[in-house]
Regions:
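Face-selective signature of the C-terminal outer-membrane beta-barrel domain
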Residues: 306-324, 346-458
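Periplasmic N-terminal accessory/gating domains of Gram-negative outer-membrane beta-barrel systems
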Residues: 78, 86-91, 112-219, 229-231, ...
Length: 458
């Protein structure tokens, strides 16, 4: 009885503790990525407001957990509003905001912000949206591809539950994808080789700062896209403390961690930060309980490490990978339709990984940025069918494909008054191999081909 009384006394305090949280972030210059000291950050509809420190950081503490709009303003820069920032009691991601410089002086006018942002180079074909918009998008389920499919000019896949992106009537394999300036060949689980489409998204939304979709008139720095470009910009990890969150969904569970590395002083921001996440599905266990013959099983992992060498130089090491397996099991109850599905379904083993290292150098005059990156991506895909798919014995058909690409990119961006110039070069070394075996037709061949490609653009 005594324990119950104590619990009832302190229970309201426990509830209150779960209804408050903290929100931190960083404000940077859009051109040279320099921190903006003294920028004002206000939570709309409240009395909460802070000013950024010398490193551009701000912190709100003991804020009620709900959805807020943040307004960021700084003298000489355009005021920016971030909508629907969801504050949680634990694990709220760090916000990173880039402000655009404004050199024009105007009379007082009323501006209404469009929900989609565009650029001067491609004002009609480029759309930019933030991670907050992805998380709060109805029906998006924290899947970036599903949100992109609802954009103007984009058509979803018409063949099954797939995340294919079809731009203006093109093909799913005609778009390219970039993660912090590094090309990634795949953004979905169980992807079709040569196309990034698949049933489940691969990228962790909590890593993303913003996503830019170019459905036409894309910049020259992108390597020969036919239909469009989808560029993902990731945020930096928390430089002051360790943070993270655990997600438990209907089909999967995942954990995300972020924080400083090699931090020496308690009150100072670390020069090295990290972001890391891993996710595991448990669909195979659910399907086993439902007595279904299919067993999809997937893992994915993602990381990003930022290291600031000095005021003008920084290094970024990032990566993304997946482990996908699709197998079959014998159900307790058989009927002709289940038997036909088991005989026709393939056994899939797919492994993907992309890793890249980037060096970013800011010009000392503050009017540009040079980026040098080296990346590699590998894909292994084994597609098999057996006379007995349950025991995986007596192979009938097998296709073992392997891709390995290494890329080097150099990009220099300079700003002159209202002009922007982009100059760069790229180099790519690719190896593709294929081993196909078909017992029914007596086919068994092994092929391998290599390519070297380089280019210049301005």
């Amino acid at each position: 009885m005594k324990k119950r009384i104590i619990f009832l006394i302190f229970f309201p305090f426990f509830i209150y503790a779960q209804n408050i949280g903290s929100l931190d972030g960083r404000i940077l210059d859009d051109q040279d990525q320099q921190p903006l000291e003294g920028a004002t950050v206000i939570i709309e509809g409240t009395s909460f407001g802070v000013v950024t420190d010398e490193n551009g950081y701000f912190v709100f503490e003991n804020i009620p957990t709900k959805s807020y709009n943040l307004t960021i303003s700084f003298l000489g820069y355009r005021t920016k509003t971030i909508y629907n920032v969801i504050l949680k009691s634990f694990g709220t991601p760090t916000i990173q905001v880039l402000l655009e410089e404004s050199s024009d002086e105007l009379e007082e006018i009323i501006l209404v912000q469009s929900p989609f942002r565009t650029t001067r180079e491609t004002p009609l074909s480029t759309q930019t949206f933030s991670a907050v918009e992805i998380e709060t998008y109805p029906g998006g389920n924290n899947d970036i591809t599903k949100v992109v499919q609802s954009m103007p000019g984009i058509s979803p896949s018409i063949g099954g539950f797939r995340n294919d992106i079809i731009i203006r009537g093109g093909a799913p394999n005609e778009s390219v994808y970039y993660l912090d300036g590094i090309e990634i060949p795949n953004i979905n689980h169980f992807s079709t080789q040569g196309s990034a489409g698949g049933p489940l998204g691969l990228l962790n939304v909590s890593f993303i700062r913003e996503v830019t979709l170019s459905s036409s008139a894309f910049g020259a720095e992108y390597d020969n896209p036919l239909s469009g470009v989808l560029s993902f910009e990731q945020r930096e990890g928390n430089s002051k403390r360790l943070a993270g969150n655990f997600r438990f969904g209907a089909t999967e569970a995942g954990i995300t961690l972020e924080g400083p590395l090699f931090k020496k002083k308690e009150n100072k921001s670390a020069k090295t930060t990290f972001l890391f996440s891993v996710r595991r599905s448990y669909l195979q266990f659910l399907f086993e309980l439902l007595d279904l013959p299919i067993r999809p099983d997937y893992w994915d992992y993602q990381w990003k490490i930022n290291h600031k060498i000095n005021k003008y130089n920084s290094l970024i090491f990032l990566g993304l990978g997946s482990i996908d397996d699709f197998s079959l099991r014998s159900p307790k109850v058989f009927d002709p339709s289940i038997q036909a599905s088991i005989e026709q379904a393939p056994i899939i083993k797919q492994r993907t990984i992309t890793a890249g290292l980037s060096w970013k150098k800011k010009y000392k005059d503050g009017n540009g940025l040079m980026t040098t990156s080296v990346s590699t991506n590998r894909l292994g895909n084994i597609f098999s069918r057996f006379r007995d798919n349950i025991s995986q014995s007596n192979v009938v058909f097998e296709n073992d494909s392997y891709e390995w690409e290494t890329k080097i990119r150099l990009k220099s961006v300079r700003y002159f008054d209202n002009w922007k110039t982009v100059i760069g070069t790229n180099f790519q070394n690719s190896t593709y191999s294929n081993n196909t075996k078909n017992v029914l037709y007596g086919l068994n061949y092994n092929t391998k081909i290599k390519f070297l490609k380089f280019g210049l653009y301005a």
